[in-house]
Every structure is written in C-alpha cells, then in structure tokens.
UniProtKB/Swiss-Prot annotation:
Residues 19-101 form the Lipoyl-binding domain. Keywords: Lipoyl. Binds 1 lipoyl cofactor covalently. Coiled coil: none annotated. HAMAP family: GcvH. This is Glycine cleavage system H protein. The gene is gcvH. Belongs to the GcvH family. Disulfide bonds: none annotated. It holds the Pfam family GCV_H. It comes from the Bacteria. Its cofactor is (R)-lipoate. The modification N6-lipoyllysine is found at residue 60.
C-alpha cells in the first residue's frame, strides 16, 4: 500500500513498502515559479531529517530541498537534470527528486497527512 505524507518544508514523501520517494509539493513549485535547474543528492548518501540535500532553482530564487526523514538515498531522478521544468508540470508525481530507505519507518507516520498539510497551508 502506498501512503503519502507531507513536511512543513513543503516536501512530499510517498512510501511504498520500504522505499520512500521524495519531491516538492505543488505549493512549493508554484511559489518558486519556473524551475530552471535541479541539483540532486548522490546515491548512497545518508541524510538526516531536516538536512538540506538537494537544490531547486527558478527564475525567482534558489531553494534547498530538505530530507523530510533520515535514511539513505537509493536513487535520484536524473530526468530532472535534463528537464527541470518537470517540477512545475508534475510536482507531486513524475518530478520526484530522490528515493530513499528510511532509518525509522515510524518517523513517516509523524509527517503531515494531506488534510493536515492543507490546514497548515491555510495558516501561511
């Protein structure tokens, strides 16, 4: 079963078995504007929750992408390097940034549900 959760830093995490796929939310890509460059983490890199591990640059600004959970990067989405505009078109689907194995599966459950994330956005 696939579940999706969200961070207050505007990343989404889709958990499928033991693999977590991470990307930025539609809200984040909308705030950034047209994305022109993406820097992805290296495969095999261990990241801590809250650690800056990727960069997304737009015509407006550059922003760090934070690891919403601790774990090891197992794959980066190389398609984003060739077509960073995918982030704008497919923020919460095909434009994932990286996949990782989690250090602690229970930490996933502590992230925001879709309803909680929408409520959080309403406070911004």
């Amino acid at each position: 079963m696939t579940e999706t959760r969200f961070s207050k830093d505007h990343e989404w995490v889709r958990l499928d078995g033991d693999v977590a796929t991470v990307g930025i939310t539609d809200h984040a890509q909308s705030a950034l504007g047209d994305v022109v460059f993406v820097e992805l983490p290296e495969t095999g890199r261990h990241v801590d929750a809250g650690e800056a591990c990727a960069v997304v640059e737009s015509v407006k600004a550059a922003s760090d992408v934070y690891a919403p959970l601790a774990g090891t990067v197992t794959e980066a989405n190389g398609a984003l390097a060739d077509d960073p505009g995918m982030v704008n078109a497919q923020a919460e689907s095909g434009a994932w940034f990286f996949r990782m194995t989690l250090d602690d599966r229970a930490a996933f459950d502590a992230l925001l549900t879709a309803d909680d994330y929408q409520a959080f956005l309403a406070t911004l």
